[in-house]
Amino acid sequence: MMKGGMAGLMKQAQLMQEKMQKLQEEIANAEVTGQSGAGLVSVVMTGRHDVRRVTLDDSLMQEDKEVLEDLIAAAVNDAVRKIEQNNQEKMAGMTAGMGLPPGFKMPF
């Protein structure tokens, strides 16, 4: 391989790494809202899966503990699914043209 070709590949790899770091930061800082019970419970979660806020409708205070626990769990699960979908969509744009098989998960 020519010297210039190798330098070009190295530069391209460095640019890709910088874009990937920026994308990872963007994904980590993104917030999604998961909901359950037709919006009676909502959970705001970051791309790092940190729960920022849990909101319960006042009407739920009359429900028994198990119903409330189930609704909170469902809202958290909804938020996690949304984060994973968001991550896949963002990574798909980044990895398009790399020739990776569909559904391939990057190790980060």
Curated annotation (Swiss-Prot):
- GO molecular function list: DNA binding
Q: Which GO terms describe its cellular component?
A: bacterial nucleoid; cytosol
Where does the protein end up? Cytoplasm, Nucleoid
Look up the domain of life of the source. Answer: Bacteria
Q: Which Pfam families match?
A: YbaB_DNA_bd (PF02575)
Q: Which UniProt keywords apply?
A: Cytoplasm, DNA-binding
**Which InterPro entries is this protein grouped with?**
YbaB-like_sf, YbaB/EbfC
Subunit comment? Homodimer.
HAMAP family given for it? DNA_YbaB_EbfC (MF_00274)
- Family that this chain belongs to: Belongs to the YbaB/EbfC family.
What is the name of this protein? Nucleoid-associated protein Avin_19840
- Species of origin: Azotobacter vinelandii (strain DJ / ATCC BAA-1303)
